[in-house]
Design a protein with these regions (language model features):
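C-terminal catalytic subdomain
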Residues: 240-344
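Short internal beta-strands
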Residues: 27-37, 262-267, 344-348
Length: 419
């Protein structure tokens, strides 16, 4: 569901088409679905960027490139529940096809360790009710979720949901994933049955992603947050999206954070919500300020109310907005920063009240924030980790140089001598 590996897609699609044509598949029987899940449905320009001019012209004008619509009830199918009772909904085009092919990438991801594989199918071609079985506080606030790892309940649910899809289809997904580096360049490409392919691709990805570097724990993390990154323009100014971004860093860096760690982050924080992209987040932010909403998990009870709001659904379907339930996924993640830090400072905010409304401290400069943190939380000689490339390049998951000092390994196994 991201466009980072578009070069892989353009190349791999051509090879896959060659194999399909050689096996007797006709062009008219091929359908491309952009697996956006609850993310904005792709525009024509998005599709052209993903597929490239040649493939776009070959398939777009015949209606053979579409974007997943999780609210198109005619083209969604309910497949029952997993053994845990999680509801499984699936794009009907994919369910009914003879050969479902997933083309994605394997890159460090705070939600379950890596993108790609069964995460792709469990989030990209389903709906909010299925996603609400794992992108929620009861899963994301468990001890096995932080720090980021590939053995959490969330990751297991991805696997279970996707395998349930395979069971009901009567055949597996064919998965083609590129392992990407810090510049989002391809390191390797793995294809085949996801259950067998994922562990192999992760073994290589681990070498780039889980970086065993730190010789000490850090009391202060310092980085900046641009306005436009990851989920789009406004990611670094919309207060709820800011919390998700902060928490994603905690998930990645928890192994090297001290118990009293604080974050100092610069953000323009100018009140730009980008209402067209996230039509519901201003309303959620306002609700968070009232009615006994003390922490973000208190908001979770409103999830179904927002997820079934017809106007917000129409904006998702027809105006390229995020689905309203996506905001609850963001808030579930957003609380993780509060759970794992002593304080978070936003510096340089133009409208600091928005940051304070999320429980963040505000100061004019890094110097002022650091002095306050020294007085209240970290002492006069804190270990400070500056991360100038944050949100500019694909992140790593920082670890202690000695793996035995990590509180948890890459696959969710806790070390008894640590946290």
């Amino acid at each position: 569901p991201t466009r980072r590996s578009s070069d892989l897609r353009k190349l791999s699609i051509k090879y896959i088409l060659k194999e399909l044509y050689a096996a007797g598949i006709e062009k008219k029987d091929i359908l491309f679905i952009i697996s956006n899940g609850l993310h904005p449905r792709s525009t024509e320009a998005d599709a052209k960027a993903i597929f490239g001019e040649e493939l776009f012209n070959e398939f777009w004008h015949t209606g053979q490139i579409i974007s997943h619509d999780s609210e198109d009830q005619e083209h969604m199918i309910y497949l029952g529940t997993t053994h845990r009772g999680d509801p499984v909904y699936m794009n009907k085009y994919v369910f009914e096809c003879d050969i479902p092919i997933l083309i994605g990438h394997v890159q460090g991801n705070p939600y379950g360790g890596y993108s790609g594989g069964y995460k792709h199918s469990a989030t990209g071609i389903t709906n909010w009710r299925c996603i609400a079985s794992h992108h929620v506080p009861s899963v994301m606030h468990r001890d096995d979720f932080t720090p980021v790892n590939g053995g959490s309940l969330m990751r297991n649910k991805f696997d279970e949901i996707s395998m349930h899809m395979e069971e009901k289809m009567g055949h597996p997904f064919f998965c083609c994933d590129a392992v990407l580096d810090t510049q989002s360049r391809q390191i390797a490409i793995y294809s085949g049955y996801a259950k067998e392919m994922m562990p192999i691709s992760w073994k290589l990805a681990d070498k780039r992603t889980y970086v065993h570097w730190a010789e000490k724990k850090y009391d202060v993390l310092v980085f900046g947050m641009p306005q436009n990154f990851h989920y789009g323009d406004g990611m670094g100014t919309n207060p709820i999206m800011m919390m998700q971004a902060l928490s994603a860093q905690v998930l990645r860096f928890k192994r090297v954070m001290s118990d009293n760690c604080v974050i100092i982050c610069s953000s323009i924080c100018n009140g730009y919500f980008h209402d067209e992209r996230w039509p519901y987040l201003r309303e959620l932010y306002d609700l968070f300020q009232h009615d006994h909403m003390n922490t973000l998990p208190d908001m979770n009870r409103l999830g179904e109310y927002f997820a079934t709001n017809e106007e917000y659904i129409r904006k998702y379907r027809y105006t390229n907005a995020f689905h309203p339930f996506h905001g609850f996924s963001m808030m579930s993640c957003g609380h993780i920063a509060e759970m794992n830090t002593s304080a978070i400072y936003i510096v340089g905010a133009e409208e600091p009240g928005y940051a304070r409304g999320m429980g963040l401290k505000t100061r004019a400069t890094f110097e002022e924030a650091l002095e306050d943190a020294k007085k209240k939380y970290v002492g006069q000689e804190p270990n400070i980790l500056a991360l100038p490339m944050t949100f500019k390049k694909a992140a790593v998951h920082l670890c202690m140089k000695d793996p035995a000092q990590d509180c948890m390994d890459e696959y969710g196994h806790r070390h008894p001598c640590c946290c």
